[in-house]
Amino acid sequence: MLIGILSKKYVKEILELLNEKGELHFSQIHKEIPTHMSSLNRTLNELVKLGLISKRKEDNKQALPKTYYKLTPLGKKALLLYEVEKIIENSKNNQNIIIQIINGKNHNIINAKIVNIHNK
């Protein structure tokens, strides 16, 4: 589930890193993300499985080829959810928020009205 993975530790940092730097190999990501290699590997594999990042292995004759990761278009859209979260957290308690998300593929505008449920 997308929301579940986005709330996991270091996922936001990984997505933002790949968005900023482009394609990186595992050790480059590990250098920036302060976690155990096994935890990072597990998280990256989950992100690949959900289609938020893509994975490719370097095509060469090395015994251990480098694995590269890159943010996908879906991953870029997922980063928008962190922005929505920030807007909601920064809003006043009694304020209604209208969020417009533009779908770049077919330019549909999706309006979502988020009402503060505490006032109801």
Curated annotation (Swiss-Prot):
It comes from the Archaea. SUPFAM superfamilies: Winged helix' DNA-binding domain. InterPro entries: Tscrpt_reg_PadR_N, WH-like_DNA-bd_sf, WH_DNA-bd_sf. Pfam families: PadR. To M.jannaschii MJ0361. This is Uncharacterized protein MJ0944. It comes from Methanocaldococcus jannaschii (strain ATCC 43067 / DSM 2661 / JAL-1 / JCM 10045 / NBRC 100440). The lineage of its organism: Archaea, Methanobacteriati, Methanobacteriota, Methanomada group, Methanococci.
